[in-house]
Amino acid sequence: MVTGLEKVSFHSNPKERQWQIMLKLPHSCTHLTHTSTVMLKILQARLQQYVNYELPDVQAGFRKGRGTRDQIANICWIIEKAREFQKNIYFCFIDYAKAFDCVDHNKLWKILKEMGIPDLLTCLSRNLYAGQEAIVRTGHGTTDWFQIGKGVRQGCVLSPCLFNLYAEYIMRNTGLEEAQAGIKTAARNINNHRYADDTTLMVESEEELKRLLMKVKEESGKSWLKAQH
């Protein structure tokens, strides 16, 4: 069953949505859940290869062998070096409001294409989100069904990959890698550290920090993310 599912998913036209039909066959709920989980794991493993290639070292969110402690240690090291060489250093800590809920689906598929993700993987990912609807129950009854056009799926193994690519696209458009502003070390210029949506900007002057922050807020707004700092 699983072998057949992988074959249908990766070696046929995903637009035919045959793999989705297979998941709707009248099997038990337990078997259905296990099968769909295996399918998502296969898709996640293939997508992760491209995520690892696209993401820079400053992004530690949802990456194997990396964590918040690494980013804290990096920032502490930068502070120590700034004190050692008697340099000013300015930080801005950015937290996006409901970042994972604000990912625009149409924007996401365009980003995957621009970042060189194979059409097959993009199409399979898009099919997971196709036709999603929700209904809200209130004290006065329930609303009509409505389409869901934003947000990555909570608890889905693909969500970290998709969000990291979405966030990386925003940061690339801010031009952080090319910016001269930042903390100069012997080997490179560092102006940000990230853990998923949590972003730290760091520069040597207040004016540089203001310019970087305004650029980040501008590009984030274009992708429906609201930066809080």
What are these regions (language model features)?
Residues 1-166:
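Conserved pre-catalytic core of RNA-dependent polymerases
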Residues 98-115, 193-222:
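Catalytic palm subdomain of template-directed nucleic-acid polymerases
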Residues 140, 227-229:
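Short, conserved micro-motifs composed of acidic
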Residues 22, 52, 102-103, 121, ...:
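Intrinsically disordered, low-complexity regions enriched in proline, serine, glycine
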Residues 46-59, 162-196, 200:
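Active-site palm subdomain of RNA-directed nucleic acid polymerases
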